[in-house]
């Protein structure tokens, strides 16, 4: 059976781990993060990195809201006719058609441009991080008035460009820039500047990782045969990673209060090892599995997590991916670990980008951080991957009921210390 689930925070601020996304992919039928079929006009030859963006960040001092409490004093005009809108997308390093962050974000921009009657969406793929700023500026120079930048790595350059170009709207996917009182990126991480006030033309898209993690926990506990499930995060200094794991544990225990949920982090200080080292992830997971004996393992560690899934596959246990449908993204990257992935906890990137582009054109989008969760179809869980038949109708009902509970508030997916590692 194929899992059909549709639901809609990474509260983060700075850059560190690359994320990919793009167009032209064939997506599996699902109400979760369905991507438009429009293909990118160009696809660079660089191999996709196929990693989720669980980047290190500094936690903002206030929770993001869909509508920031501070009204911007000025913002770019949203009264332009459809023909006046021009949308550009700057992806992270990799390819547009990576079945990951770049692809789904790009497809959301294409859908949004179609909704508002704009022309073809232009896309730029950097060869490396040094090109972020110049590619963003190129779109400014060529008259694009909605610029979508994909992933945490572009947060600083996006904020700098937004400050310098108040007549252009910027959509930062999975971004919450830390800015000072002038609106510039704050290297001291004081984050004293208010985004909505100082960057009234910037929208940072954030997601409820705890809700997506909760759904993954439901699946894990439901398919576990030995009542022991595990989760490995990249580092406990990233609130988004911690939220995923906290939600996962609560979701698993909602199915089986007596289940053993073992969680750990690959590193406590080294972000490179935490998110960009598949070998370290595999070695860590090998020992984790040997020591704790889970028969389901959830990864929240970017590229490092790909190694975690490889370890799970080698050990003959089930894997759960993160951020995007990793059954597809790892297969696209020729990583055999995809064969063991039952499902993935998703951020609905295409849905959220499309909604934001459409709202900008309609004049209803406020600046600051926009929060996507179950209520607005911002998060979800992937169709069943390699574990064909594992997700039964009964498990699907548990998932559907949990989504309904998230929407009406009866299901709590994160403790009071949400996002803070104990």
Where are the language model's segments positioned?
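Bacterial N-terminal signal peptides that target proteins for export
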Residues: 1-10
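C-terminal motif of bacterial Sec signal peptides marking the signal peptidase cleavage site
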Residues: 16-19
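Bacterial signal peptide processing site
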Residues: 21-24
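Post-signal peptide N-terminal segment of mature Sec-exported envelope proteins
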Residues: 28-54
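A residue-level marker of the well-folded mature domains of exported/periplasmic proteins
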Residues: 44-51, 55-422
